[in-house]
Amino acid sequence: MNRPVKGAADKAGKPKVKRKTREELEREARERKKDKKHRGHVAGSRTQEKASTDQRSGQRKAADPRIGSKKPVPLGVLDSAVAKPKPKSKPSAPVENVVAAKPTMSPEEELEMLENDSRLDALLDRLDSGETLSAKDQSWVDETLDRIDILMEELGIELGDDDEEEPQEDMLQLLKRNNPKDAF
């Protein structure tokens, strides 16, 4: 059981590695540090558009991703029916249903609602007490009162102002009385 000698065979098979100088070691360390510094994403890469989309659309300008959609936003029941592009294969019957779905009140219901409006009552009380309303409030009061007048005319309701007027006297009664204020 002979053991091989370690030192003699190992030295003969491998060439001797030259040790690096201090300057070489420092230069390699600087390069490694430089490589580590440049790892990761560049600054602002989250907000940048992908480069692959720019390559596909060659003529298209690079758009700012912060700008939102150009699709119109529906603001109400009628606006949403108008803003939607009409499909060519389907008839326009659903659009008519949307327009007809707008809740309409009878004139009596609308008049009742306007007469019981707490905002209108509060603003009219402020006007009666001598306060000056803002232009916005004043225009709203005027529009609401005009609408009430229109609804009352539609329904054939007359204002209750007739009670304040003096009853008309008969011409014969005036002549018989010989009232001095009626004489010219």
From Swiss-Prot:
Membrane-spanning residues: none
DNA-binding listed as a keyword: no
UniProt region (Disordered), positions on chain: 1-107
This protein's UniProt keywords: GTPase activation, Ribosome biogenesis
GO BP term (any one): ribosome biogenesis
Single GO MF descriptor: GTPase activator activity
Low complexity composition bias: residue spans: 80-95
Any Pfam family: YihI
Keyword DNA-binding annotated: no
Compositional bias per record (Basic and acidic residues), positions renumbered to this chain: 21-32
InterPro entries assigned: YihI
Role summary: A GTPase-activating protein (GAP) that modifies Der/EngA GTPase function. May play a role in ribosome biogenesis.
Family named by the database record: Belongs to the YihI family.
Subunit note: Interacts with Der.
HAMAP family per record: GAP_YihI
Protein name as annotated: Der GTPase-activating protein YihI
UniProt organism field: Pectobacterium carotovorum subsp. carotovorum (strain PC1)
